[in-house]
Amino acid sequence: QFQKPGDAIEYRQSAFTLIANHFGRVAAMAQGKAPFDAKVAAENIALVSTLSKLPLTAFGPGTDKGHGTEAKPAVWSDAAGFKAAADKFAAAVDKLDAAGKTGDFAQIKAAVGETGGACKGCHDKFKEK
């Protein structure tokens, strides 16, 4: 899929940047830092849902060093733990996507909290600060 390990690292970093940007817009609404707009929330959640499937394909062999990677060695040394964290993130994003489709603020807010927790759980163990 990727010509060089550096291409994979840049790909996953770009995908995570986009996810964080679109998730952040919804999180700001959930935290009361931005006015809630169900349509805007749904649009951003749909993007998070689509984008969330991209970066995890880019943690292949040779992508553990260089190109500004912030992935900890545990991504590869604890592959089962990393997969479990990725699965938890995917499940949380699925719930977020379902909540976004309802347009209900309370459901979106709860799903944002769960998704944010899944992000943090993975970052704490598998990402350099």
UniProtKB/Swiss-Prot annotation:
Transmembrane segments: none annotated. The keyword Disulfide bond does not apply. One of its GO terms (cellular component) is periplasmic space. The keyword Transferase does not apply. Heme c binds at R12, Q13, T69, E70, C119, C122, H123. One of its GO terms (biological process) is electron transport chain. Binds 1 heme c group covalently per subunit. InterPro entries: Cyt_c/b562, Cyt_c_II, Cyt_c_prime, Cyt_c_prime_subgr. Keywords: Electron transport, Heme, Iron, Metal-binding, Transport. Cytochrome c' is the most widely occurring bacterial c-type cytochrome. Cytochromes c' are high-spin proteins and the heme has no sixth ligand. Their exact function is not known. This is Cytochrome c'. It comes from Rubrivivax gelatinosus (Rhodocyclus gelatinosus).
